[in-house]
Structures are given as structure tokens and as C-alpha cells.
């Protein structure tokens, strides 16, 4: 097994622990994955999220810094780092990161929501309201997209069932 394969296995073990809220064990496994593959951005991002769940903002920020260095186009890394900065009390850096996440992905509802919460916290109600409106809009768009995709899938399924029934009726 190669280092990357072993790192992937440790990553999967770490994520299994994360899912069941064993954040300490998750961090241990993800750290092993990072040791084996120091460019494993997703392992850094996931370990940072686990640190964030344990209220270890400093460690989380360090991991999200690594992700940003490895993948500067990761809107999620900026968003998560913004959450860590906010948790550490650095609202200015948090706002900068939420803004950067939204520059990278203008449809990133979670970043709008986080920024709205921060705006509300620092007394910028008008900006918070604008961001909540955007979250609402994006939610409606996502629901509509899901419904449309589901309708297309269902139409195709009904067509296939009809063809299958026709074949059965014709004795094929």
C-alpha cells in the first residue's frame, strides 16, 4: 500500500469518527493521514472542522491556513476559517474570510448565513438582512433545482416502466 493509499485509509477512519462525534479520535486519524501526505488538503480541512467542534479555534485556523495555501480557490476553507476567527473573537478577519468565500462562490449560502450572523452580532442589521434575503433566495433556487431534477428523473423512470410494460404485453 502506498503512502497516499494509507493516508486515504486514515482519512476515512478519521471521517468515520467525525460522523459519530468522536472528534478527538477523528483528529488523531486525520493527523496520521496528514503525516503520510502533507498535501492532503481535505484531511487538513476535516481536522480543522474537528478542532472547531472542540472549540480549539487556534488549531482550526492553522489547519484552514494550510488548506488555503494548498488550494487558494477553496471557498469552504475561507468560510470555515472565518468561523474559527469569529470563535476566537477576531471579527474583522472573520468578515474578511466570509467575504473571500463569497467572492470565490457567490452561491455559497452557508457563507452568507455566517456573515449575516456576524453582521447581526456587530450591529450591522441592514447588511445582515440583505444576507438573510440571499440565503432565502438561494434556498428557493436549490429547492426548485432539486424538484426539477427529481421531475426529470421521475419522467425517465416512468418512460422506462412504460417501455418495460409494453415489452411484457408484447411477450418479449
Task: Tell where the protein language model's regions lie, with residue ranges.
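Alpha-helical tetratricopeptide repeat
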Residues: 1-172
